[in-house]
């Protein structure tokens, strides 16, 4: 039974799952939107929203270091702090939207686009 299980496992072990989420978050920060499976989009949304909430704090070295420990890409962290987080200074949350786009041709996996609001 799945009582009190909060994580999306995505059929991967923890290190593989974390690197997948980190790579997806770098992609959405760089491009603004991302097409992926619905399960991966649902797993990515809480992770990226927590990063944006942390990045909204004015220039702080500790915040930059925390973000670098999470996504490990200097350019993405800089863009997250300087561009993405500044768009949402007045917004209390809900920075991402998931739009279902149908099913993938090869294996009929449900697909979705995750993008910044």
Curated annotation (Swiss-Prot):
InterPro entries: Ribosomal_bL17 (IPR000456), Ribosomal_bL17_CS (IPR047859), Ribosomal_bL17_sf (IPR036373). One of its GO terms (molecular function) is structural constituent of ribosome. Keywords: Ribonucleoprotein, Ribosomal protein. It comes from the Bacteria. One of its GO terms (cellular component) is cytosolic large ribosomal subunit. Coiled coil: none annotated. One of its GO terms (biological process) is translation. Gene3D superfamilies: Ribosomal protein L17. Part of the 50S ribosomal subunit. Contacts protein L32. Belongs to the bacterial ribosomal protein bL17 family. This is Large ribosomal subunit protein bL17. The gene is rplQ.
């Amino acid at each position: 039974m799945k009582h009190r299980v909060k994580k999306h496992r995505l059929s991967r072990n923890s290190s593989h799952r974390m690197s997948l989420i980190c790579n997806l978050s770098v992609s959405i920060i760089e491009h603004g939107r991302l097409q992926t499976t619905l399960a991966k989009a649902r797993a990515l949304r809480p992770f990226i929203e927590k990063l944006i909430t942390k990045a909204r704090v004015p220039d702080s070295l500790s915040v930059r270091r925390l973000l670098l420990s999470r996504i490990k890409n200097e350019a993405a962290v800089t863009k997250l702090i300087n561009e993405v987080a500044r768009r949402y200074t007045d917004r209390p949350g809900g920075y991402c939207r998931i739009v279902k786009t149908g099913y993938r041709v090869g294996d009929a996996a449900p697909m979705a686009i995750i993008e910044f609001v």
